[in-house]
Amino acid sequence: MNSNEFLLDSGFWGFLYKILTPVEWLQTWIMKIVHDFFVMLGVSPIGVSWVLAIIILVLVVQACIFPLFYKQMKSMRKMQALAPKMQRIQNKYKGKTDQASREAMSRETMKLYQDNDVNPAGSCLPMLIQGPVFMSMFYTLSAIPYIANGKRDALGAFDVATAKQFTQTDVFGIVSVTDNFTSAAASGKAVIGIFVFLMCFCLWFMQYFSMKRNMAAASMNKQTETMQKAMLWLFPVMYIFSGVAMPFAVLVYWLTNNVCNLCRTLWQVYAFPTPGSPAAADKEKRDHRNENARRAKAGLPSLEEEALAKAKEEAERKATQGYQRQQPVRKRKKK
């Protein structure tokens, strides 16, 4: 931050962030509008208002991608339902490596997707959107100190005056939004450490909860379990090293985003569990109870009573027919 040149504006990163300029521009204006709104309500312009602006920005981004996430969940549910049919197609062409067989397998697979309105790439879209948004946020918050001291041109709503106001913001009077772990005072280091820990915990718990509650027993072999356990600890550890290098403003964004992702994962496992997982078994019981409650409210028989009535009816039918199996009528071919 003390360099006269903003390194993210040069080389490959400069080219990449130049492409993301529209996203960066939009982010600055959302933050500025939210900040001005809180100031209008009486919040200090150089205090918590900028922190709230960052948090609201995360919520706006999450609200924008939620419809895509919901569509992703529905697509994944369809993909899971198609798994047996996919397995049959793969078994049909198992061991066939010639070009014609591969093309035929690809055609049958695509037809299966089209007939069931499934897009296999749809599950990647929310992640593809969140990546550039986070990169743009990191760039914007890192560039603000350079805008404030005149070492960089204005970016969107952040001119020199606005950038200076932003850099004067601190949290609890302890840590500036532009501080990172190495530049902060001892008390600031403690606050940053707490934020990094919470970030790591949110990520760890999100993965742990998904692994324990949303993994089908049939898909869990020793290799998969080993890989899942490695990822459970690998990414939180990576967060530690990257988190201490980030400006505190980025940590606010990152922690808020992780909390939102954790809440979304909890809802996903509750509403769209993986078939065969413990969460799916709980959902089946829950749906069963809810259906019986709905039937009771409408004065209808419960699922158990309905099944018992059908079984009794079938038994009476068999008794009447003397357990004789009705032979199918053979159709004559037309000449």
From Swiss-Prot:
Its main subcellular localisation, reduced to a broad class, is membrane
Indicate the segments annotated as coiled coil, or none if absent: none
Record's Gene Ontology CC terms? plasma membrane
Its record classes its membrane topology as: Multi-pass membrane protein
Which residue windows are transmembrane per the record? 46-66, 127-147, 191-211, 232-252
- Ranges for the region named Disordered are 277-335
Q: Where is the composition biased (Basic and acidic residues)?
A: 281-294, 307-319
Enumerate the UniProt keywords alphabetically. Answer: Cell membrane, Chaperone, Membrane, Protein transport, Transmembrane, Transmembrane helix, Transport
Q: List this protein's GO terms for biological process.
A: protein insertion into membrane; protein transport
Q: Where in the cell is it found?
A: Cell membrane
InterPro entries per UniProt: YidC/ALB3/OXA1/COX18, YidC/Oxa/ALB_C, YidC_ALB_C
The UniProt GO MF terms for this protein read: membrane insertase activity
Highest taxon in the source lineage: Bacteria
**Functional summary from the UniProt entry:** Required for the insertion and/or proper folding and/or complex formation of integral membrane proteins into the membrane. Involved in integration of membrane proteins that insert both dependently and independently of the Sec translocase complex, as well as at least some lipoproteins. Aids folding of multispanning membrane proteins.
Q: Which PANTHER family match?
A: CYTOCHROME C OXIDASE ASSEMBLY PROTEIN COX18, MITOCHONDRIAL, OXA1
Question: Could you describe the subunit structure of this protein?
Answer: Interacts with the Sec translocase complex via SecD. Specifically interacts with transmembrane segments of nascent integral membrane proteins during membrane integration.
The family classification in the record reads:
Belongs to the OXA1/ALB3/YidC family. Type 1 subfamily.
Name recorded for this polypeptide = Membrane protein insertase YidC
Query: Per the UniProt entry, what species is this protein from, by scientific name?
Result: Bifidobacterium longum (strain NCC 2705)
Gene symbol? yidC
